[in-house]
UniProtKB/Swiss-Prot annotation:
Enzyme class (EC, first level): hydrolase
Protein name per Swiss-Prot or TrEMBL: Deoxyuridine 5'-triphosphate nucleotidohydrolase
Cofactor(s) essential for the protein: Mg(2+)
EC numbers for this chain: 3.6.1.23
Pathway per the UniProt entry: Pyrimidine metabolism; dUMP biosynthesis; dUMP from dCTP (dUTP route): step 2/2
InterPro entries: dUTPase, dUTPase-like, dUTPase-like_sf, dUTPase_trimeric
Record-level Gene Ontology MF annotations: dUTP diphosphatase activity; magnesium ion binding
Keyword Magnesium: yes
UniProt-listed HAMAP family: dUTPase_bact (MF_00116)
Length: 149
């Protein structure tokens, strides 16, 4: 387990830090650091503060903000940017772009768990320009080229 620096921006988050729900959880739950309930109308989106900032420091790591499966499946609440990528050198408050893709209004309550944070390894690439690639079984076959199902 790696240690990550966290800055508490809103004092209410001091005892609400991201946590793994179970020993096998990959994602840490992020909470909506709101002063009042926030109602998202159908097809509306809003940046929701989490009340914390993290600093990964090491460029071998990044964080991803992902939707909570229950909110997406049961209520249509997903991320407006689909995935939030947090670079290792970012130090600002974590924000969740909440998007209501359903046809009914949804209310986010203060301190409700609204997304999850997953820490991932990163390999930075350096491009090597070539005029041709060596042959492979797939070649330039694109969408659907490997068959159905």
């Amino acid at each position: 387990m790696i240690k990550i620096d966290v800055k508490i921006i809103d004092p209410r988050m001091a005892d609400q830090l991201p946590a793994y729900a179970t020993p096998g959880s990959a994602g840490l739950d992020l909470r909506a650091c709101l002063d009042a309930p926030l109602t998202l109308l159908p097809n509306a989106w809003q940046l929701v503060p989490t009340g914390i900032a993290i600093y990964l420091k090491d460029p071998k790591f990044a964080a991803m903000i992902l939707p909570r499966s229950g909110l997406g499946h049961k209520h249509g609440i997903v991320l407006g940017n689909l995935v939030g990528l947090i670079d290792s050198d970012y130090q600002g408050q974590l924000m969740v772009s909440a998007w209501n893709r359903s046809d009914v209004a949804f209310t986010i309550e203060p301190m409700e768990r609204i997304a999850q944070l997953v820490i991932v390894p990163v390999l930075q690439a350096q491009f090597n320009v070539v005029s041709e690639f060596p042959a492979s079984a797939r070649g330039e076959g694109g969408y659907g080229s490997t068959g159905k199902g």
